[in-house]
Amino acid sequence: MLTERQLIILQVIIDDFIETAHPIGSRALSKSEYLPYSAATIRNEMADLEDLGFLEKTHTSSGRIPSEKGYRYYVDHLIGPMNQHEAGILRKYTDGEFFEFEQVVQMTAEVLSELTNYTSIILGPEMFEATLKQIQVLTLSDHTAVAILVTSTGHVEHRSFALPEGIASSDLEKLVNILNDRLKGVPIIRLGEVISTEVAQLMHRYMDDFEASFDLLRAFFMNEHPVKLYFGGKSNILMQPEFNDVDKIRSFYALIEQEDEIANLLKNTHQGIKVSIGNENKVEAIKDLSLITASYHVGDNLMGTIALLGPTRMEYKKVISLMKGISDEMTNTLDRWYKGDS
């Protein structure tokens, strides 16, 4: 457990390094208005913080910089709420009038990158505005079948699935008829909701093996929506001193171009804010970066992920509060827009 003095010194060191990207020593810190301690006292505390793993030396300076452990402690214990200026910017943005889902998401990506000077990525469902036009099910064998979904946008999707043990062909036929009757014209994002209510009631009434059929339906329709990526500030990373290295730049842009890998990186994000610092990231290309993610919703549907990529000396105070605010505002805006209240 850190002492109050160590906490203050650690916070000042991290704040300074985030702003300057330069190591700092005890003499410079002793001149800070936030540290009423002598250079000798600060030097001793910095040595203890280094022994504890919160600070580390560089090869080119006698000063210290935060370690990943230091950043992690900073994120977990020293972050405050969003300031009024940032909250005002978000409200101004969300007060705008939007006519398309893509407009909302792309604007969010651009605003987030502009406010932070980092690279923003938003994972969104591809078929948010599409409705179901038709569904067909073709049995391939006693154990497998393929469903063909056609949407109002002309998108055709084939999904193979395993048939429940012993399901009758008559039940499968009834199921397809019920789905086409009740789901035609329903937005893709609302399929799970309608299936859980209207469709479930009809299945219970008319089908012999309700449980097996409903389990099949739940596994089939209530999975993740197809995804699309929206970027903001792809070149912002070039403004960071850490990216003077050509190999780092090449590696980063190679990752950005691999949208499937980015989608896989973001799509399993849990609800709320998550901060991954440096080596906490599993993808090699971002092990020198920090990744902050937040989820957004429409109603009860988890629709996607908002993400920011930046250096490990990221402005965590600002970014985390912004991510929380923009996640909430985006959820509210999309909810109002989707329900036709705005």
UniProtKB/Swiss-Prot annotation:
SUPFAM superfamilies, from UniProt?
GAF domain-like, Winged helix' DNA-binding domain
Q: Print the keywords alphabetically.
A: Repressor, Stress response, Transcription, Transcription regulation
Tell me the disulfide pairings in this chain. none
Q: Name one GO biological process term.
A: negative regulation of DNA-templated transcription
Q: Which GO terms describe its molecular function?
A: DNA binding
The answer, when asked if Kinase is one of the entry's keywords, is: no
Check the record and name the InterPro entries matching this protein.
Answer: GAF-like_dom_sf, HrcA, HrcA_C, WH-like_DNA-bd_sf, WH_DNA-bd_sf, WHTH_transcript_rep_HrcA_IDD
Taxonomically, which superkingdom?
Answer: Bacteria
Family the entry assigns: Belongs to the HrcA family.
Role: Negative regulator of class I heat shock genes (grpE-dnaK-dnaJ and groELS operons). Prevents heat-shock induction of these operons.
| Protein name from the UniProt record | Heat-inducible transcription repressor HrcA
What phylogenetic lineage does the species belong to? Bacteria, Bacillati, Bacillota, Bacilli, Bacillales
